[in-house]
């Protein structure tokens, strides 16, 4: 159940704070706004989404496979505005009963799961009919030049340096192919200024399990 990336975990812990200061915190608030009931957050990392959950959420099961990130997540859980339970687990094998969640939250995780199809199938399995999939991910670029740069990055050092992360995944298409209906979708660049990099194109949205 454990996925160990000690160097990446240390780097990500620092980088996530800087990202939030640069505007990611606002995206995290939008990601979970309006949620209610029981939520499963997959690949919850070091818990940067936890402060933003609204009070209508009755509980969050925060699943994280990397031990160091999970320890940071556990430390952050008591300060969350809603009850949080931390668990070890993989996106492809969630420790959750069928049709038991009102929402599943995916935040910068579908870029690095070994199998998006299986991970999204699991998300659909644990959601009740009509439940929401909320997603905030970096994705394949819409411009040919940046797509070429992403393919080069994915074929060389990027996955090795970033714990299996891939930049050229068409995550929105994968969500639709998994049987979800996308009801909200915002495409943007992050960070918003400077020269775009392989991980600059982002999406934030919501999908519904029929």
Language model: regions and residue ranges:
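Conserved alpha-helix/loop element of class I SAM-dependent methyltransferases that forms part
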Residues: 15-38, 48-52
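A short glycine-rich, Lys/Arg-flanked "PGG" loop and its adjoining helix->strand segment in the class I
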Residues: 117-129
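Conserved beta-strand signature within the Rossmann-like core of class I S-adenosyl-L-methionine
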Residues: 130-138
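Short alpha-helix
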Residues: 164-179
């Amino acid at each position: 159940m454990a996925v160990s990336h000690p160097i990446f975990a240390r780097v990500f812990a620092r980088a996530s704070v800087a990202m939030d200061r640069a505007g990611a915190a606002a995206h995290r608030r939008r990601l979970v706004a309006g949620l209610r009931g029981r939520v499963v957050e997959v690949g919850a990392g070091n818990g940067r989404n936890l402060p933003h959950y609204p009070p209508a959420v009755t509980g969050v099961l925060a699943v994280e496979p990397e031990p160091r990130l999970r320890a940071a997540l556990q430390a952050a859980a008591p300060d969350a505005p809603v009850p949080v339970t931390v668990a070890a687990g993989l996106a492809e094998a969630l420790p959750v009963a069928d049709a038991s969640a009102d929402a599943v939250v995916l935040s910068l995780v579908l870029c690095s799961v070994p199998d998006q199809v299986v991970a999204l199938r699991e998300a659909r399995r644990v959601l009740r009919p009509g439940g929401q999939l909320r997603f905030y991910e970096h994705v394949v670029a819409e411009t040919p030049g940046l797509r070429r740069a992403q393919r080069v990055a994915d074929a060389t050092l990027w996955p090795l340096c970033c714990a299996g992360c891939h930049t050229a995944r068409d995550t929105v298409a994968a969500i639709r192919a998994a049987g979800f209906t996308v009801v909200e979708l915002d495409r943007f660049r992050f960070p918003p200024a400077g020269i775009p990099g392989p991980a600059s194109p982002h999406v934030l949205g919501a999908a519904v399990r029929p």
